Amino acid sequence: MNNNTYNSPFNARYASKEMQYIYSPDFKFKTWRKLWIALAEAENELGLNVTKEQIEELKAHADDINYEVAQEYEKKFRHDVMSHVHAYGEQCPNAKGIIHLGATSCYVGDNTDVITMREALMLVKKKLVNAIASVAKFADEYKNMPCLGFTHFQPAQPTTVGKRATLWLMDLVMDLDEVNHVLDTLMLLGSKGTTGTQASFLELFDGDHEKCKELDRRIAEKMGFKACFPVSGQTYARKLDTIVCNCLALIAQSCCKFSNDLRLLQNLKEIEEPFEKNQIGSSAMAYKRNPMRSERIASLSRYVMIDALNPAWTASAQWFERTLDDSANKRVSVAEAFLAIDGILDLYINVTSGLVVYPKVIEARLMSELPFMATENIMMDAVKKGGDRQELHEKIRQHSMAAGAVVKVEGGQNDLVDRIAADPAFMTTKEEILAILKPANFVGRAPEQTADFLKEVVTPILEENKDLLGVEVEINV
């Protein structure tokens, strides 16, 4: 690391080496050369004066990029594409005259951007599938463990620890659907020329429109795409960047919601994120176990969600066939959206793979509230024994208010069960009430819902994507 210049936190702390490489100059310029080779091959196949020997020469130097030469040309030309055209030409003297034939800068620039986004989305998909697998394992393990539910962060009907985790899972499943959709519908720009009319290629092909269309089709096929944009200006529609970044923002929303839930649960001492043996939570308060990883997920997620506004503004501000005010913004915003979501998913996998659950705390909190929730069952049992429903309802209200005061005002334990057992109107004993207060009686279909969801939705996803499972993540704290 150079300590005398700015170093991006994405490189030093957040993004994986895999994602950093996808957005590296090396990946970019090697892709340029692959595109020039694909163009030359397609032009050869369609009858232009491009020889197989020239193509083989291009292929021989596809990966050994002469960066120093390109940099010298850029000082002279002030144009990155032409600098690399000339640098490539020095390595391929026989093919020099056909490199970039008929193309404009966006042929390599925009097509490379789409290829890069596809590669990055595939890495995102891999990590998303592993995140789903991690949470699914947790949900299955704890599907039967009752816990207090919360609405408005106030005590509500009980659920189970595993069922709560399925809410996180459902979000991720929806995100995976969106990633798959974007991957399935990505299109290359193709070979459209300076204003999208393919005029230069129409000239090369002596007015043959079908060959111009076939050129696009063959380039798409060679680069692994189903199609190119059927119409465009000089660039592909910048709305594509918005679609991709919105997809990443959806993942960020899911991860942020999870991190917020976990931070609240850690405060309640019910579930904690992993905490290393020698990890320090605070420089001042030695006892602290701060949820640093969850906080980082939340922090980076905000960045991705806000960053998605950049391509939206860029797409809306393009003039006619193109303007260059997109370039600097998209160069930063799209790359950093991917670098950030990559770091978020690494954290998500790391945290969910090592969640620490405290069953006794979970049970104690549930049991402190369960008597209030069981009052209707207790009342119905007393009515069956001959009690008056309206009278019993009023007594439960009074006992509940009194028990609530003991907890909130006096800081004592919930004594509602003792109060009801001591009231002859209910014709019951403490033992009979405690028999009603079995947490499993109050969780509804939570265990079954969890099991069904895992079996019917999650397992097929994991089976379909089993070749993506087993990712190793490294967290830089």
Predicted regions and their residues:
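Amphipathic alpha-helices that form helix-helix packing interfaces
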Residues: 39-42, 124, 128-131, 135-138, ...
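Active/binding-pocket-proximal capping segment
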Residues: 272, 395-402
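Short, well-ordered beta-strand elements within core beta-sheets of diverse protein domains
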Residues: 163, 242-250, 377-385
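Glycine-rich cofactor-pocket loops
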Residues: 140-162, 272-288, 321-328, 353-373
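A helix-coil-helix interface module used to build multimeric assemblies
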Residues: 2-220, 281-282, 292-296, 391, ...
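Glycine-rich anion/phosphate-binding loop at the beta-strand->alpha-helix junction
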Residues: 175, 179, 226, 233-327, ...
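Long, amphipathic alpha-helical stalk/connector segments used for oligomerization, subunit docking
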Residues: 303-389, 395
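Short beta-alpha connecting loops at secondary-structure transitions
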Residues: 20-24, 69-71, 279-299, 321-336, ...
